[in-house]
Amino acid sequence: MIQSSLYRALNKGFDYQILACKDFKESELAKEVISYFKPNTKAILFPEFRAKKNDDLRSFFEEFLQLLGGLREFYQALENKQETIIIAPISALLHPLPKKELLESFKITLLEKYNLKDLKDKLFYYGYEILDLVEVEGEASFRGDIVDIYAPNSKAYRLSFFDTECESIKEFDPITQMSLKEDLLEIEIPPTLFSLDESSYKDLKTKVEQSPLNSFSKDLTSFGLWFLGEKAQDLLIVYKSIISPRALEEIQELASLNELDCERFKFLKVLENAQGYEDLEIHAHALEGFIALHSNHKITLLAPNKTILDNAISALDAGNMECVIAPFVLNFKTPDGIFISLNSFERKKKRQKSKLALNELNPGEWVVHDDYGVGVFSQLVQHSVLGSKRDFLEIAYLGEDKLLLPVENLHLIARYVAQSDSVPAKDRLGKGSFLKLKAKVRTKLLEIASKIIELAAERNLILGKKMDVHLAELEVFKSHAGFEYTSDQEKAIAEISKDLSSHRVMDRLLSGDVGFGKTEVAMHAIFCAFLNGFQSALVVPTTLLAHQHFETLRARFENFGVKVARLDRYASEKNKLLKAVELGQVDALIGTHAILGAKFKNLGLVVVDEEHKFGVKQKEALKELSKSVHFLSMSATPIPRTLNMALSQIKGISSLKTPPTDRKPSRTFLKEKNDELLKEIIYRELRRNGQIFYIHNHIASILKVKTKLEDLIPKLKIAILHSQINANESEEIMLEFAKGNYQVLLCTSIVESGIHLPNANTIIIDNAQNFGLADLHQLRGRVGRGKKEGFCYFLIEDQKSLNEQALKRLLALEKNSYLGSGESVAYHDLEIRGGGNLLGQDQSGHIKNIGYALYTRMLEDAIYELSGGKKRLEKSVEIQLGVSAFLNPELIASDSLRLDLYRRLSLCENTDEVGQIHEEIEDRFGKIDDLSAQFLQIITLKILANQLGIIKLSNFNQNITITYSDEKKESLKAPSKDDNDILETLLKHLRAQISLKRR
């Protein structure tokens, strides 16, 4: 009722400075009313901020920055004597917040002089994290004369200094790291946390460090807010405030859970609801009927543009309507009239880069070399070769063997990724055994690729059941989803529709994480088949999945006349059901492999979920069932981009990488384990009638943990699940847990990644330090998939037992709930879920031997080779030039940044890409020096040589030798033996050769 009540209040006179609402959704609706009816009032929207007092704010970092940004905006508007109002979820107003003096910003002006040490100190006291690389808000870096600052709720800026003078200010893109062209004259730098000086910073730091709070990071980011004392204020008391009735209910509920003292809210005025005023929720398909029903009311219709407005008017009786082009979302009814909007809220997608660099090479990590196999990356080292300095990666192999890999050949290695429980073994250098192993794997991969291509070719010859995909009912079906489709879902639906309406049978793989909306996309296809008179089968590997899909489909198709049935080992009257399927009395049949023997009257579509989990015989039966019908396979296992491209030569691939708009990242807490904390975590979830995953990765002691939990919380209903429990019993336990008959699932790992358990929204991970970064991220992703917020607790037995690297990793996970869906994550997901079954045949043995990256690359090559595509060039050019060439540490001080650039340069496929990286280096680090420029020339030579079939470039003094793959040699003479002359002579010659070749 927020919009209609607020509209009424505005008409009666409204001079409040704060409006507290139930949640962000209600706040958003209220802001629309203020913005439309009081356009001169600055309406500032606060985020939800569900931190409880003394919570570690790293887990709420993004919202905390937004909250401080909104508050700073409010103080500035008051200072400028501008009429303003804060509209906030009540959760954002429950704690005292910083006064104006703690949120002061400062300016940096072009051509002014600044002491860089003082600037660095100031940013540090303002809460900025000083790092090598700036990627997210609240970070800054100082690299010689170049300073990067990413201001919260603002933009990322790059400043260039000449001595102390600021000679350039530009924005830069934190994802590409490249600055934009336009120069700025002045920028404003707000604090990330609070505007403190050295003295006030030290005072606050001391208060935090001396507090008894349980945390691994007793710093201002985590706890500063709770110790501001008189420098913070209760906004609801200081400024004239009013709350919505639903916000009052929220306060009362929190009070009933003893999380809040109700007394401090008693003085607040409550926004009144009144008769004749109500908020509306009208779906597009019901609009015409609604307007006809209210023809005696004055109706105001809002639309984002003239086209949408004209289309609406032509379909409606516009006699009593006032039409307005405005972007606001207003849907409410008053005694005087009705407001209806054709607009919807636009969720701004944050372009964000993952801070958790999963593919970063760190010393001590396992790597696999294309020719020499599995070893351990030791360090980045510099050696003199032929009297010149070059950089190498040192890789340790079996025994005392070491390989020095020139950095220009970094593309020959990849991080070793197999299954997370497999322990790699080092290979021995010089025995040739790894090359034999590769040859064996290649033979097997050619066999697999051949089968895939053969099947695709067979299916390609079959005429498909052509469907009409432009039916109006499909649009109505979409509008009843209850949520907005993501752009990925829209794209996948369009791709599937194109397949269904062609003359060929569809063969498409739909991949996407659990909760990303694969089932909705599949249901759209099933409904399309139904409208065209065809039956569909949805085949799943487990009874629990069958049960879940059946409930989902039954609810979704309830009003659309689709008859849905389920066939699994629990289904009663199987024969009767099979007869109904044969007679065409069932439109969509869902079930386990029990479906595979069913006879259909008019089967048009087969959808399979998690196909790789079926056995060999079941896969054969599946192939038979789907032989001449449209086939859609769904998988929660992501596919790395390059393999995706190779597979797309022979089958359709759609990927869902965007989470649903209302999905919130799970809150993550890193804590030292104790009994009180465990009780608090479990009760916190039970109070909201939820369930808990408790991960304890040690079967031998799992019963002890169960006993301990039962001692702490008597009557707690706990189920145990681990790999030694047989499949049927495991499934039974999961079914009981899904039904809510257990409160805690105590297990060694979440056995079934594809299962959606919307009521389990807290996960506790015992001894989190023993898990890999990707495992922890995966486990965290198991909660927070429904409407409720997820909570993830990484518990450590003893803080002192953690090394610095492990602590850093865990703190990074705590602060960064976002993880990019890039290539590295796909590999790591495969590591956890076991990528061995990716193509339906278990290949985990081969993957264990050669690692996932090399395996997929070889598979891509096999597919390209057999389907007549382009095979990658495997030859590496050997560079034996007496030239000093490396990325200079004086220019790029950080080893990890240099290593990243080396990796990217080694992967360049053309000289344009090298030129782009050259520009980027100058932009990010300053003018490039001779040594770094010479390394870029070496990379350019390597690319040109590859194009000409050259395998080696070498020199002795000014005499240069070029060796071709057919052993032919060519000699050149440079003007001198200087590095520059050698490189220029070679570049000029190779470019001329390529020009001749192109003629």
Swiss-Prot record:
GO terms for biological process: DNA recombination; DNA replication; DNA replication initiation; double-strand break repair; regulation of DNA-templated transcription; transcription-coupled nucleotide-excision repair, DNA damage recognition. Its EC number is 3.6.4.-. The keyword Iron does not apply. GO terms for cellular component: cytoplasm. CDD domains: DEXHc_TRCF, SF2_C_TRCF. Residues 677-833 form the Helicase C-terminal domain. In the N-terminal section; belongs to the UvrB family. This is Transcription-repair-coupling factor. It comes from Helicobacter pylori (strain ATCC 700392 / 26695). The lineage of its organism: Bacteria, Pseudomonadati, Campylobacterota, Epsilonproteobacteria, Campylobacterales. The gene is mfd.
